[in-house]
């Protein structure tokens, strides 16, 4: 099959997306892609989501934090951003997604908006609710194990882990 001339080929834009979830959430690329397609279909309808052509082209996720590059057609960036914003859960795990930026090439999007994933610090001495508990520290954010109820999100100053 012959290649299309350059002026006929579809032009793409790449959305750099940040993903946050609880530390025990295991979210695979296919799960995030499915949630994105579902959100785009619900928001834009079948013709609109097909026109936007949102697709995850790069993905990394570990310990509750991840990044993705989402491809969208050039004229549909605002609709693709709205579809990404509609993703609130992936495989029953609540997630927070944010579009960090938009670029015309994958390389530029990676260099400008994706910073790589730092390794979170797992600790067993987080002071929370008058007790020492297990927790995961990521920068100023701390996710504390709250018994059978799951996780509680807090800041370092709330947990007494300043400067340690």
UniProtKB/Swiss-Prot annotation:
Keywords: Cytoplasm, Endonuclease, Hydrolase, Nuclease, tRNA processing. InterPro entries: Pop5/Rpp14/Rnp2-like, Rnp2-like_sf. This is Ribonuclease P protein component 2. Belongs to the eukaryotic/archaeal RNase P protein component 2 family. One of its GO terms (biological process) is tRNA 5'-leader removal. Pfam families: RNase_P_Rpp14. It catalyses: Endonucleolytic cleavage of RNA, removing 5'-extranucleotides from tRNA precursor. Its EC number is 3.1.26.5. It comes from Halobacterium salinarum (strain ATCC 700922 / JCM 11081 / NRC-1). One of its GO terms (molecular function) is ribonuclease P activity. Part of ribonuclease P, a protein complex that generates mature tRNA molecules by cleaving their 5'-ends. Its main location: cytoplasm. Disulfide bonds: none annotated. It is an enzyme of class 3 (hydrolase). GO terms for cellular component: cytoplasm; ribonuclease P complex. HAMAP family: RNase_P_2. Consists of a catalytic RNA component and at least 4-5 protein subunits. It is found in: Cytoplasm.
